[in-house]
């Protein structure tokens, strides 16, 4: 007994620190991934808040035409954004000490790169921390696997896409209208709506919402009756009560009759695996689609696919989308180039007479 006490007393400061970091008894689990997650996410969050409020305009296109994104420079919550790093910087690592001055760093959009790189490191560590806590508690690792879907999506738009396009200026701005601008330009340049992986992502997100609503409403409606046939079932149930009221047999019977027998799960684990896997796989595919379109492997092109016997084009929905894409493309970065790439790359049509 004495030897054990001596060993505890002689435990080093480092040993006590390790035990505290990896203890699952803490109110909030830290873990070794948390040691990196906490400072990176705090840095990204604090710089985002400061830059969103007060950052000066950024020369995003590298043509000496700064774009304002902060609240103090005339924006509101909807129009405000952290403007991406300048095209003049490209993919160069651009910390503060690489600039001649802080003013130059701000003018070239240094905060965007700082926020994005810290944020991606932070959310990756959050995913690792989920696995680490699951491991400490003897759980299975699927929580972290599910979280990998939004991590992959964020990595695709903030890192993979800029790498493929050759500049952080092509990354998604950190703001509401900036996000929509990114989506519109992405459609114009890559025809993402005609990409099968994006279609799978839409099915994953909308399907996941539908299944979540169906599951929640079904569980809430499946009561173990606490009342007689002569009074409402609601009388035996208090909204939000802690005691379980869910009966999977009743839910299975209801849903099997509403649609058909095999559309309903009678196994709770199979049901919840499906609820988790459907949106996760869909978002994985979307992230993969963004990552391939980053290198210009774009959505399907069915432009002018249908012609009559005289060779005249019969417009289809694909041609309508193509015209919309061209319109969006000529509107963005309108001072950076005279023609969008699609228009500049083709030969001029020949004229008769």
From Swiss-Prot:
Q: How is the protein altered post-translationally, as described in the entry?
A: Tyr-161 forms a radical intermediate that is referred to as redox-active TyrZ, YZ or Y-Z.
Report if keyword Plastid is assigned.
yes
EC number of the protein: 1.10.3.9
Question: Which residue positions hold the site described Tyrosine radical intermediate?
Answer: 161
Answer yes or no on keyword Transmembrane helix: yes
Entry's Gene Ontology BP terms: photosynthetic electron transport in photosystem II; response to herbicide
Q: Where is this site: Cleavage?
A: 344-345
**Additional remark text:** 2 of the reaction center chlorophylls (ChlD1 and ChlD2) are entirely coordinated by water. Herbicides such as atrazine, BNT, diuron or ioxynil bind in the Q(B) binding site and block subsequent electron transfer.
Record protein name field: Photosystem II protein D1
Source organism per UniProt: Petunia hybrida
Primary gene name: psbA
